Regions:
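Signature of dsDNA virion morphogenesis modules
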Residues: 1-142
Length: 142
């Protein structure tokens, strides 16, 4: 049974080719935003960074959570998130910085996965069906 999300629209068949590393000025944290390759952001997901390792230069964050309204009033089911993540793994795999829509040198997706069960990373609870990603960022300025 599909859960209702107040005033939100379901995203289906998302084709995601970029993941951006961006700053959110209000709280000075980095977030991930997903968008279409054609340069038009068809939806944004301000996922939280759940782990950062300065030694390996790896940043792990939530790309999209199931049944959670995003910043544009949209949501995705677990099944649609899985489809989008698999499409990204096969066709996307690009990282940019600050919505530039230009592939970022020195940033590589090293891991992308769907949570198979609820679990914890530090103090963060990750819900089953959440799309997570680890990006290696070689640029110390980022």
């Amino acid at each position: 049974m599909k859960q209702k999300i107040r005033n939100a629209y379901e995203i289906t068949d998302a084709k995601i080719s970029f993941v951006s590393l961006v700053d959110k000025a209000a709280n000075k944290r980095q977030f991930l935003i997903t968008k279409a390759e054609n340069g038009q952001a068809n939806f944004a997901s301000y996922g939280r960074i759940v782990k950062a390792d300065a030694e390996t230069h790896h940043v792990t964050g939530v790309v999209y959570e199931p049944m959670v309204e995003d910043s544009h009033g949209n949501y995705m089911t677990e099944a649609e998130i899985t489809k989008a993540a698999y499409w990204f793994a096969k066709n996307g795999d690009k990282v940019d910085l600050q919505h530039s829509f230009e592939p970022m040198e020195g940033a590589t997706v090293v891991e992308t996965w769907i949570a198979k069960a609820d679990f914890q990373i530090g103090d963060e609870t990750i819900t089953k069906g959440t799309w997570l990603m680890t990006v290696e960022v070689k640029d110390d300025a980022v």
